[in-house]
Amino acid sequence: MKLLAMLGAPEDAVLRAAQLRAQGISGVYTFEGPNDPFVPLIRVAGQVDVDLMTNVAIAFPRNPMQLAHLAFDLQRLAGGRFTLGLGSQIRPHIERRYGVDFDHPVARMREWVEALRA
């Protein structure tokens, strides 16, 4: 069984990941909150032997091609231990925080994932 723990702020990411690994945690995750979900993972990749994942990275405010490049590079830096988790978030959050339309979220997410896989 794999145990995962939340990573937290980017400035403490490497130290926290190393401490968690020493405690038997096999992977760390981030989410779209007060910090960018990718920066802590980039800091840990190649430094600590743990699985890395975004629990939820919000898709719609991002460009799928740019995120595809970021995920590809992070996967290489992590030696194949990165998992990208995406989410759509809720309408008020997307429209107010990011100023992005939230029309047809299921169809948009499908198109988004197809573009990401391309």
Tell where the protein language model's regions lie, with residue ranges.
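N-terminal beta1-alpha1-beta2 module of alpha/beta enzyme domains
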Residues: 1-55, 61
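Flexible, glycine-rich active-site loops centered on histidine and acidic residues
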Residues: 2-6, 64-118
